[in-house]
Amino acid sequence: MNDITAAASVIAAALAVGLAAIGPGIGQGNAASKAAEGIARQPEAEGKIRGTLLLSLAFMESLTIYGLLVSIVLLFANPFRG
């Protein structure tokens, strides 16, 4: 593998994980904040809010996992290898 291609693949893998974690991280923080706010306003709806929160957090976390999978492909099964 060309040295430049190898270096670019490592940088791309790091960026894939880093950038894939920024959006969901901010979204998870906002969702947890609003869920806590909603539970404080309506304690009787706690179960419904918590269930919805956990489902949405799982969907947000899947985006980070996709970034991790892209970085693993770039590091170990690099399609740009000659």
Curated annotation (Swiss-Prot):
Keywords: ATP synthesis, Cell inner membrane, Cell membrane, CF(0), Hydrogen ion transport, Ion transport, Lipid-binding, Membrane, Transmembrane, Transmembrane helix, Transport. The chain crosses the membrane at residues 6-26, 57-77. The record marks E61 as: Reversibly protonated during proton transport. The keyword Transcription does not apply. GO terms for biological process: proton motive force-driven ATP synthesis. InterPro entries: ATP_synth_csu_bac/chlpt, ATP_synth_F0_csu, ATP_synth_F0_csu_DDCD_BS, ATP_synth_F0_csu_sf, ATPase_proteolipid_c-like_dom, F/V-ATP_Csub_sf. GO terms for cellular component: plasma membrane; proton-transporting ATP synthase complex; proton-transporting two-sector ATPase complex, proton-transporting domain. Its main location: membrane. It is found in: Cell inner membrane. F-type ATPases have 2 components, F(1) - the catalytic core - and F(0) - the membrane proton channel. F(1) has five subunits: alpha(3), beta(3), gamma(1), delta(1), epsilon(1). F(0) has four main subunits: a(1), b(1), b'(1) and c(10-14). The alpha and beta chains form an alternating ring which encloses part of the gamma chain. F(1) is attached to F(0) by a central stalk formed by the gamma and epsilon chains, while a peripheral stalk is formed by the delta, b and b' chains. NCBIfam families: ATP_synt_c, PRK07354.1. This is ATP synthase subunit c.
